[in-house]
Every structure is written in C-alpha cells, then in structure tokens.
C-alpha cells in the first residue's frame, strides 16, 4: 500500500505544516477608518522590532487617543519619531494618507484594496509602489511587479519604502542557513522531487529517476494520483 503524498499530509493540518503564529508579533493594520476619516491623529514610535513572520521589521506606535498599533517600518524611521495618520498628515516618510492626498511620483507602501481594510498591497521588505496618475474616481498606482492598478482615492497608503531591502543580496552559501531560515516559519523543508522518491511514496517514484508515465493528470483524479500537470492544456515548449 502506498503512502500519503506531501499535499495529502498538508491537508490534514498537523503541526508540521501549521504556521507558528504564536511566535509572530501580531496583525499589522491601520487604525479603523472611523477614527481618521475626518481628522489626523498623531503617534510616537516606541519600538522597532524584528518579526519572524515578515520580511520587514515592524514598529510599535502609541497614538494620542491611547491606541497602540503595529505598523510596517519604512526605511529611515526612528524610535521617538512622530508620525501622523489622516487626510491632513504631511507627505513625509512614515505618515499615512488617503491616495487622493498623495502627490504623483511619491513612493508608497501598505496600500488598502478597499477603504478601511487596513492595508493589503506592497508589504514585503524593500518594496514600494509609485503613484502614477489620478482621475476623478480612481488613482493609478504602479506596483512592484510593474502592473498598473487602479485604487479608490479613499484607500490609505503610507509614504516611503518598506525597510528590510537587500535581504536576498547575501547568499545563504550552505544548507544549514537555509534550515534555520525555513525553521523560523515552520516551513516544510527540504521538499524532494517525486522522481527522487521511492515508488511507495509517489506515483513518479522508483529507481528510474524519470516519471515513467504521462505527467498530465485529470482534474477529477483521486488525491493520491493528482500530481504532475493537473488538467494541463499542453506541456513542454510552445510550438
């Protein structure tokens, strides 16, 4: 009898595959919209911390209304620095404003997809987006991928570039460093290829080191057979 595939084990939900959220600093979201829709709130950066669950550092900010929030730290943010959230906030690093109030050509990050959702786009270390143009009912933003996306002018974003850039410039060099990199987030690593497994572990397994059968499979295949190119229209190079 064969053994369960990795994706079958993952679907069971055992601790091996669960995210260790108890190690993470917490959710990073903007202050609810009803607090900052008509007024600007001042906050002070109390601490900048490493977050194992992110590629960027986070900052703990205490606001004048008594709320404490975690924000994604931009490059150049300092402990003790004052930041502002609201429609009248100055266009300076670390401040959060509606897209309608941000000039064209400004670097921004942590952009809301829908007004009030707390920030969804451009949150990884070293990333930034660019305000390209604006129209009456939308603002065009260039995302890190180069895609131009239209946002509601009331969506909020933070001025600056996310800290933590250059993280991938230093090579890992050895497998031991990769081990600790993945262990921090409880990632299943290493992940062997199916053709390198024994026949009992994978449909492509065995000692031939090639699949030995077509790599395309049906969308309706049973879980233990659903590997390879699932419901593929074509495989290989385009002709």
From Swiss-Prot:
Subunit structure as annotated in this protein's UniProt entry: Part of the 50S ribosomal subunit. Forms a bridge to the 30S subunit in the 70S ribosome.
NCBIfam families: PRK09612.1 (NF007180)
Protein name: Large ribosomal subunit protein uL2
Region of interest called Disordered, as start-end residue ranges on this chain: 1-20, 203-239
Gene Ontology CC, one term: cytosolic large ribosomal subunit
Function: One of the primary rRNA binding proteins. Required for association of the 30S and 50S subunits to form the 70S ribosome, for tRNA binding and peptide bond formation. It has been suggested to have peptidyltransferase activity; this is somewhat controversial. Makes several contacts with the 16S rRNA in the 70S ribosome.
UniProt KW Transcription regulation keyword: no
Family: Belongs to the universal ribosomal protein uL2 family.
Keywords in alphabetical order: Ribonucleoprotein, Ribosomal protein, RNA-binding, rRNA-binding
Pfam family, one: Ribosomal_L2
Listed SMART domains: Ribosomal_L2, Ribosomal_L2_C
């Amino acid at each position: 009898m064969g053994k369960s595939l990795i994706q079958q084990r993952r679907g069971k939900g055992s601790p091996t595959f669960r995210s260790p959220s108890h190690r993470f600093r917490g959710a990073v979201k903007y202050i609810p919209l009803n607090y900052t829709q008509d007024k600007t709130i001042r906050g002070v950066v109390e601490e900048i911390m490493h977050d194992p669950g992110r590629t960027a550092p986070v900052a703990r900010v205490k606001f004048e209304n008594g709320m404490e929030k975690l924000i994604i730290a931009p490059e150049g943010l300092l402990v003790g620095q004052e930041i502002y959230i609201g429609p009248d906030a100055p266009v300076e690093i670390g401040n959060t404003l509606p897209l309608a109030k941000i000039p064209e050509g400004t670097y921004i990050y942590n952009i809301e997809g829908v007004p009030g959702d707390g920030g969804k786009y451009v949150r990884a270390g070293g990333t930034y987006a660019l305000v390209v143009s604006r129209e009456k009912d939308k603002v065009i933003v260039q995302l890190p991928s180069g895609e131009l996306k239209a946002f509601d002018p009331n969506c909020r974003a933070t001025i600056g570039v996310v800290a933590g850039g250059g993280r991938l410039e230093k090579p890992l060099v050895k497998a031991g460093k990769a081990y600790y990199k993945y262990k921090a987030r409880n990632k299943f690593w290493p992940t062997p290829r199916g053709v390198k497994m024994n026949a009992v572990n994978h449909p492509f397994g065995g000692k031939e080191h090639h699949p030995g059968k077509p790599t395309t499979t049906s969308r309706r295949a049973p879980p233990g057979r659903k590997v390879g190119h699932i419901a593929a229209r074509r495989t290989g190079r385009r002709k």
